[in-house]
A protein has these predicted regions:
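Glycine-rich ThDP/TPP pyrophosphate-binding loop and its adjacent helix/strand module
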Residues: 61-64, 114-282
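Thiamine diphosphate
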Residues: 2-153
């Protein structure tokens, strides 16, 4: 499925278009991190499927008016995976290719962790867990102040490290208590951190924990687009805050780094990128 033109792209069926677009996003992530010689490629590749479906099919946003009051909010709590968001914001029309090429450069719109100066970014994030609290605060403010019949959602994208932080769990208890039905969190459960597998340091059953805190809980294959769609529809109709726990594979689609902590916080080698692009047919 090697397609380099819009004409070829339009000949694809919907599933092929989705797959190709996700693979292109992964290519942008790998190239951006490699060009900066710094960053985190593995996490964006595990989170790419959910985030693509979210942005392309569910978010209420307007790239021509990034600060539109009636937009949904997205908080990337797992801020070090920001090359994923920048790549998607580029495809949505918020950013330019030069912005991606300037990833992690001083003064750019694409710093190493998200900042609200970047069009389409709703929160400064970096310290793990902080974005969970920020997203819950946004959802509470929206619920308290909304004077519109349009239900606006706050989405949090979180990873293993986020939910290991007390700030995230403390805020989550409040979200359940306040029944913030306009809050949806995706937990990218790839079970890998920079030093190894999460089982080395954490055995928490987060599905049971969030259920006990009063959340609507779903567990899905985080790479299955149909499961992602259904989980988002269910979450949007819940009368509780929702957590979607997606079992994913770090560096999904890479040539040799799937499941590997080596993919977490270092650029892929040129050979790995080349072989991965061949595998993904991009």
């Amino acid at each position: 499925m090697s397609n380099n033109t819009i004409t070829d792209f339009n000949k694809l069926n919907d599933k092929q278009k989705d797959l190709l677009t996700v693979n292109i996003i992964k290519g942008l992530v790998m190239d951006g991190v490699r060009n900066a010689n710094s960053g985190h490629p593995g996490g964006p590749m595990s989170l790419a499927d959910f985030t693509y479906i979210l942005y392309s099919e569910f978010l209420t946003i307007d790239p021509k008016n990034p600060d539109w009051e009636n937009r949904d909010r997205v908080v990337l709590s797992v801020g070090h995976t920001c090359m994923l968001i920048y790549s998607i914001l580029y495809l949505c029309g918020y950013l330019k290719m030069d912005d991606l090429k300037n990833f992690r450069k001083l003064g750019s719109l694409t710093p190493g962790h998200p900042e609200i100066e970047t069009p389409g970014v709703d929160a400064n994030t970096g310290p793990l867990g902080q974005g969970v609290g920020m997203g819950i605060g946004m959802a509470l403010a929206e619920k308290a102040s909304s004077n519109s019949s349009l239900k606006r959602f706050t989405y949090i994208l979180a990873g293993d490290g986020d939910l290991q932080e007390p700030i995230a769990l403390g805020a989550s208890t409040l979200a359940g208590h306040w029944k913030l039905s306009n809050l949806i969190m995706f937990y990218d459960k790839n079970d890998i951190q920079i030093a190894g597998n999460t089982s080395r340091v954490d055995s928490t059953d987060y599905a049971k924990l969030y259920d006990a805190m009063g959340w609507h809980v779903q567990e899905i294959d985080g790479h299955n687009h149909d499961e992602i769609r259904l989980s988002l529809k269910n979450a949007q109709s819940s009368d509780k805050p929702s957590i979607i726990i997606g079992k994913t594979i770090i560096a999904k689609g890479s040539h040799s780094l799937e499941h590997s902590p080596k993919s977490h916080g270092s650029p892929f080698s040129e050979d790995e990128i080349k072989l991965t692009k061949e595998k993904l047919e991009i």
